Design a protein with these regions (language model features):
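Catalytic-core segments of class I nucleotidyltransferases/pyrophosphorylases
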Residues: 123-126, 133, 138-146, 158-161, ...
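A structural signal for short hydrophobic beta-strand segments in well-ordered beta-sheet cores
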Residues: 25, 165-168, 216, 227
């Protein structure tokens, strides 16, 4: 099963640390938040990734092209006649990463539509945002998705408090969206989706197609959108304060998403 990650955002609300790089390349410790997300999935055995690139895509491409040199000890002849000799196998050597150009200004729905050709024959794929981490139980998430047979499962999380909430009915079926946060302690869309291939029936050809609007609203009307409840840690990196929080947790070895 492939894991699709949305990596095309500008990071306009966190320009202090993302001025010349795409948002998923903002670092936690010495590595991008994108790497942390991928590493988390890999801990559950999911190592086949499709990255939806947009703004500053060359930065992400360069990171993966040069990844082996970045993380390995090696010996190199400065004459340039021979390839470097690497001295150990690095942990991520079995990752398969497809880097897909999905447009500079394409919105989330358009980006997902454009990577359909890279999913092969898989009927199910995972999808998440390239700017948020959590300690979601990926195995339980997939099992829940398979149990109900609907088109899309999103992970419902309890947020810091500046997001629109989900209206959730019986059995986890999503009935609608509340744009303004309430004081009820409700759940929001935290990403970490599991998707049936039937999702593409809800994606039209518009570049400005926002997955979280028309397609998800249609899924709600059709009774095809379900929520996997997650009451553990979840945190996006949308502001400089959140950048500091995630780096502080990581530096103190208190990061809940670190399973490695």
């Amino acid at each position: 099963m492939k894991t699709v990650i949305l990596c095309g955002g500008y990071g306009t609300r966190i320009r202090d640390v993302a001025d010349n790089i795409p948002k998923p390349m903002i670092q936690i410790g010495s590595l991008p938040i994108l790497w942390h997300i991928m590493k988390y999935y890999s801990c559950y055995g999911h190592k086949d990734f499709v990255l939806c690139l947009g703004y500053k895509s060359e930065v992400i491409k360069e990171f993966f092209i040069n990844y082996k040199q970045r993380v390995s000890d090696f010996t190199i002849s400065l004459e340039g006649r021979e390839k470097p000799t690497y001295h150990e196998k690095f942990a991520e050597a079995d990752w398969l990463v497809t880097l897909a150009e999905t447009g500079l200004n394409a919105m989330t729905g358009a980006r997902v539509r454009k990577i359909k050709k890279y999913l092969g024959d898989d009927d199910t794929f995972m999808l998440t945002y390239g700017d948020g981490v959590g300690n979601i139980d990926i195995e339980a998430l997939i099992a829940y998705h398979k149990s109900h047979g609907k088109v899309l499962t999103l992970t419902g999380v309890q947020p810091p408090g500046r997001f629109g909430e989900l209206s959730v009915g019986q059995g986890g079926k999503i009935d609608g969206f509340n744009e303004k946060p309430q004081s009820s302690g409700g759940y929001i869309n935290g990403g970490f989706f599991v998707c049936s291939r039937r999702l593409f029936d809800y994606l039209d050809d518009r570049e400005d197609l926002v997955l979280e609007r028309d397609p998800m609203e249609r899924l709600v009307r059709d009774g095809e959108l379900m929520m996997f409840q997650h009451d553990g840690f979840w945190q996006p990196m949308d502001t400089y304060r959140e950048y500091q929080l995630l780096n502080d947790l990581y530096a103190k070895k208190m990061a809940p998403w670190v399973k490695w």
